[in-house]
Swiss-Prot record:
Active-site residue list: 86 (nucleophile), 172, 174
Keyword NAD included in the entry's annotation: no
Lineage: Bacteria, Bacillati, Bacillota, Bacilli, Bacillales
Molecular function in Gene Ontology: ATP binding; GMP synthase activity
The protein's name in its UniProt record: GMP synthase [glutamine-hydrolyzing]
Known EC number: 6.3.5.2
Source organism of this protein record: Staphylococcus epidermidis (strain ATCC 35984 / DSM 28319 / BCRC 17069 / CCUG 31568 / BM 3577 / RP62A)
PROSITE patterns: GATASE_TYPE_1, GMPS_ATP_PPASE
């Protein structure tokens, strides 16, 4: 991952903490660029990156376990400020000559510390609530260090070597439970590391455009466009950088939401004057999906067919050297560090063929999802597009449970459009993480007018979440739910019942398939 030399950087080294991405995000929220890297990064690479500061993350291991994660101690001699968090503090203590031992019992939860007003705690009250999560404890600090915070359970809640600008805290400042955690991190970034905080989406665009132009030159780029936020932002950024050297392929597999295909062509083809090839492949996809009910088989068929269609269209183009992808920083982190854990595979449409001889361009692979949205706004993409609902690669194919037919797709498409319209009218778009309708394949008896019906049931799924890893069902007002239900039953053919999913994640997932 190349990075402009003039850009201030805080380097976060990963020791397996569940909060490691949070550290990176907190730093970026301060206007300072931050990257998460494996703890085994070389001294030479650190020197090349030239960070203003280094943060050692927490982790689940003991520093005394066989094979426990460590770093090259030369890091402490680079003259770069270092902050160790939990495991990072214990490792620092051990490597610099202090003593660490296994605690009698793991300390987990809120604790109260008493802090001195030094650089790290500058401007903060002496007594504050923090979040502890550790099984080792420091019993003797290295030479040159002093205690800057203690607690009822430990004499060494925070330590510092002011001369070498090396710090350690036995709690997690990056989590919300730590009362002044953001302030502590800001003190480290601004006061200790002397960062100015000038990283913005505006200068990110300037830097990325220059990088794209240098990489591409006068050659051509191909972009697979789904109409989703990530690929749309990538396409607009590339178009801003290289104009007509970019060609986008938009595969319409017939599993899109109502009006989505036309919207992509109108907003991006006409609105941004981009060269987009729309491939109408509905019949091709539906013929492959005929008679298939198993969700994994459906997903695989849709993914494979997308690849084949894209490959066929790409083969018609000549002199294309680059392929652009909307890879996010979360994808890079999960695939790039030894401590990464894969929680759940995403609904990607599938990898592109290995024999496609393109160089990759991934201009947003240093950004988190919320940063991509901010980038989209800065690029001039309308807010209603930037804040569109997340949509899985297989599209409505996994929101029709069981076999997919045109009639079933129409029910989901129309009911989902009604749901989104009412949510928008009620001003709830930003309050609900994700919302959509599903067709669970259940028919039930109903009465419409003077006639008995035996028609489909539509399910509504709406959840609140911070990151999508866990979620709770949204507490939508009953009157709003009644409005949604009434409109669906009255406006969508062959539906006589609407149900609301009130299950959290876990145990269920957000999507039904």
């Amino acid at each position: 991952m190349e990075m402009a030399k003039e850009q201030e950087l805080i380097l976060v080294l990963d020791f397996g903490s569940q909060y490691n991405q949070l550290i990176t995000r907190r730093i970026r929220e301060m206007g300072v660029y931050s990257e998460l890297h494996d703890h085994e990064i070389s001294i030479e690479e650190i020197k090349r990156m030239n960070p203003k500061g280094i943060i050692l993350s927490g982790g689940p291991n003991s520093v005394y376990e066989e094979g426990s994660f460590t770093i090259d101690p030369e890091i402490y001699n680079l003259g770069i400020p270092v902050l160790g968090i939990c495991y990072g503090m214990q490792l620092t203590t051990k490597l610099l000559g202090g003593k660490v031992e296994r605690a009698n019992e793991r300390e987990y939860g809120k604790a109260t510390i008493n802090a001195k007003s030094d650089e790290l705690f500058f401007g903060l009250p002496s007594e504050q609530t923090v979040w502890m999560s550790h099984s080792d404890k420091v019993i003797e600090i290295p030479e040159g260090f002093e205690v800057i915070a203690d607690s009822p359970s430990t004499n060494y809640a925070a330590i510092e070597d002011k001369k070498r600008r090396i710090y350690g805290v036995q709690f997690h400042p990056e989590v919300r439970h730590t009362e002044y955690g953001n302030d502590l991190l800001r003190n480290f970034v601004r006061r200790v590391c002397n960062c100015t905080g000038e990283w913005t989406m505006e200068n990110f665009i300037e830097i990325e455009i220059e990088k794209i132009r240098q990489q591409v030159g006068n050659r051509k780029v191909l972009c697979a466009m789904s109409g989703g936020v990530d690929s749309s932002v990538v396409a607009v950024l590339l178009h801003k950088a290289i104009g007509d050297q970019l060609t986008c392929i938009f595969v319409d597999h017939g599993l899109l939401r109502k009006g989505e295909g036309d919207m992509v062509m109108e907003q991006f083809g006409e609105g941004f004057d981009m060269n987009i090839i729309r491939v109408n492949a509905q019949e091709r996809f539906m013929s492959k999906l005929k008679g298939v009910s198993d969700p994994e088989r459906k997903r695989k068929i849709i993914g494979n067919e997308f690849v084949y269609v894209f490959d066929d269209e790409a083969a018609k183009l000549t002199d294309v050297d680059f392929l652009a992808q909307g890879t996010l920083y979360t994808d890079v982190i999960e695939s790039g560090t030894k401590t990464a854990q894969t929680i759940k595979s995403h609904h990607n449409v599938g990898g592109l063929p290995e024999d496609m001889e393109f160089e990759l361009i991934e201009p947003i692979n240093t950004l988190f999802k919320d940063e991509v949205r901010a980038l989209g706004i800065e690029l001039g993409i309308p807010e209603h597009l930037v804040w569109r609902q997340p949509f899985p690669g297989p599209g409505l194919g996994i929101r029709v449970l069981g076999e997919i037919t045109e009639d079933k797709l129409e029910i989901v498409r129309e009911s989902d459009a009604i749901l989104r319209e009412v949510i928008r009218e009620e001003g709830l778009e930003r309050d609900i993480w994700q919302y959509f309708t599903v067709l669970p394949g259940i028919q039930s008896v109903g009465v419409m007018g003077d006639y008995r019906t035996y028609d489909h049931t539509v399910g509504i799924r709406a959840v609140t979440s911070i990151d999508g890893m866990t979620s709770d069902f949204a507490r939508i007002d009953w009157e709003v739910l009644q409005k949604i239900s009434s409109r669906i039953v009255n406006e969508v053919d062959h539906v006589n019942r609407v149900v609301y999913d009130i299950t959290s994640k876990p145990p269920s997932t957000i999507e039904w398939e």
